[in-house]
């Protein structure tokens, strides 16, 4: 697994409030934890894989081991200046993920979509977004950018979203 952050996350990281609190959900070995922490952000890393999570201990401000698909939501009532989700989809969590975005905060989401089965794994439609599904999940947020197509290196079918929760202030500065 590459340690390089997703270009989508890197593109939008500058719009996260300085010294902000960031949730990296289903963080895996922590490529985004490391990248975001290096930018001075306080990252909460959540994953079910203890060994993967251990790779970001000492870097993340907080590490939470949780099986997001079997356990109760591990962050009730908590909100973050940004929520980052990449290469992960569990539809029952979509409302909780959006609810974690604080006023003035960002949701950065990038994962596989229908059509991915032509490029490789995942190929199970239960783990692939339907057309427009990520936009539906962001209801109540202001969409700053949305992409739905084939990303390169490696080729994969994805949907990407950057969305902001208005707080009555100006939207984040775009990079």
What spans do the regions from the language model cover?
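Conserved beta-strand signature within the Rossmann-like core of class I S-adenosyl-L-methionine
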Residues: 105-112
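A short, conserved alpha-helix within the catalytic core of class I
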Residues: 89-100
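Class I SAM-dependent methyltransferase SAM/SAH-binding core
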Residues: 31-70
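Core SAM-dependent methyltransferase catalytic element
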Residues: 152-175
């Amino acid at each position: 697994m590459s340690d390089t952050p997703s270009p989508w996350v890197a593109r939008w990281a500058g719009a996260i409030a300085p010294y902000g609190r960031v949730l990296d959900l289903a963080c895996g070995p922590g490529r985004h934890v490391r990248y975001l922490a290096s930018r001075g952000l306080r990252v909460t890393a959540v994953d079910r894989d203890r060994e993967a999570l251990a790779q970001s201990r000492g870097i993340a401000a907080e590490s939470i081991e949780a099986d997001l698909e079997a356990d109760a939501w591990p962050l009730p009532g908590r909100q973050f200046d940004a929520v980052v989700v990449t290469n992960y989809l569990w539809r029952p969590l979509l409302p909780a993920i959006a609810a974690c975005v604080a006023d003035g905060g960002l949701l950065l989401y990038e994962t596989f979509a229908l059509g991915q089965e032509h490029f490789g794994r995942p190929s199970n439609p239960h783990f692939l977004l339907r057309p427009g599904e990520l936009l539906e999940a962001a209801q109540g947020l202001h969409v700053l950018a949305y992409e739905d197509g084939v990303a390169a290196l490696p080729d994969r079918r994805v949907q990407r979203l950057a969305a902001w929760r208005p707080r009555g202030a100006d939207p984040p500065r775009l990079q």
